[in-house]
Amino acid sequence: MAEITAKLVKELRDKTSAGMMDCKKALIENKGDMDKSIEWLRQKGIASAEKKSGRVAAEGAVGSYIHTGSRVGVLLELNCETDFVARGDLFQGLLRDLSMQVAACPSVEYVSVDQIPESIANKEKEIEMGRDDLSGKPDQIKAKIVEGRIGKRLKEMALLEQPFIKDSSINVEELVKQVAGKIGENIRVRRFTRYILGEGIEVQGPDFAEEVASMTSG
């Protein structure tokens, strides 16, 4: 197996315009074989999708999903380049799958890690730095542990980082790239909203003292 060097990854990226992580994964999967790695990226729809990623995706559709029991609902905006593609079965299927994904992932609040405000990342760091299991550890080791934990936590909040509910061997970002490759257009998840029945409503129950008094009176 050829060593997967940074130079090899860059060479594959230059040939396919795919992302660095996708290129590295392709080379690992194909034991460093360049031709097989290129074919692997094409089969995944990644290479062609990356080449189109600079084009503006201003069309698309807003999809909805209501979970069984009508207790959770999702609205999601998915963009593409043309109205023709937006009406197609592949795009509409992706829109529904993504809406279902949001409904199934209560921790997800943002489309990507890049969208998470710095204030939230700082708050997570503050929480992790204060954990008891880190006390007494050298600062350098503590910093690495905290960095890893924060990275994991932020990924849990991002839709594109989630394992796809219908195929956990890929994440949502890879799913979007695959469909974009098949369609031949850039696809972008712009935003979503999740509604949970009763969320934020404070249920008023009887005052405990009054309840006891009513039971003992008379």
UniProtKB/Swiss-Prot annotation:
Gene Ontology CC entries for this record: cytoplasm
Pfam families in alphabetical order: EF_TS
Single annotated GO MF: translation elongation factor activity
SUPFAM superfamilies (UniProt xref): Elongation factor Ts (EF-Ts), dimerisation domain, UBA-like
NCBIfam families: tsf (TIGR00116)
PANTHER family: ELONGATION FACTOR TS, POLYPROTEIN OF EF-TS, CHLOROPLASTIC
Family annotation (HAMAP family): EF_Ts (MF_00050)
Name of the protein in its database record: Elongation factor Ts
Gene field: tsf
